[in-house]
Amino acid sequence: MSINEVRYLPECGSTNAYAKEHFEEFGPVGAVYTTNQTAGRGRLGRSWVNAEGKALYYTVAIREPLAQPATLPLLASLAVRHQLQLRYGVDCQIKWPNDLLLNGKKIVGILCESVSYGYQQQGRGILCGIGINLAQPQSYFCLLYTSPS
């Protein structure tokens, strides 16, 4: 599965919301990313606090049918964890169902959502949104993520 299109937005309310609104424009697989997300959210409607220029927010929009869509949050967690370890030597832990922790503090949040599209909303797809804290001071983690959501 290869990505057909990747869009960069200097600022975005929510990459998941943007990907949902523009879902049919992406082709089978597309992505959108930003470093300034002003209305991000997590599971159960929880807010995700923006840290302009200090985090990467992106969403992959998948129209291809997945055999086991419920496994996508775990697969995304494993993939992000592997890349952080491989590229940066960061050894983080997975907190099921959608977080990665470093020294007990949340550094990655993942939100997967289903989306309907097409004629009478009969098509089915999935969005996988990932927020990664990149350059936060220690105080940021102490204030915001003392208890991961």
What positions do the PLM features span?
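N-terminal lobe of the biotin/lipoate ligase/transferase fold
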Residues: 1-86, 108
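Short glycine- and Lys/Arg-enriched binding-loop motifs that mark or flank ligand-binding interfaces
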Residues: 36-41, 49, 95, 100, ...
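Basic, gly/Ser/Thr/Pro-rich low-complexity segments located predominantly at protein N termini
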Residues: 45-50, 114, 134-136
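Residues at beta-strand starts and edge strands
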Residues: 54-56, 124-128
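Acidic (Asp/Glu) carboxylate-rich active-site/surface patches
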Residues: 79-121, 130-131
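Conserved beta-strand-loop-short alpha-helix elements that form
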Residues: 127-135
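Cytochrome P450 core scaffold surrounding the K-helix E-X-X-R motif
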Residues: 136-143
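Conserved small/polar residues in nucleotide/adenosyl-binding loops
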Residues: 145-149
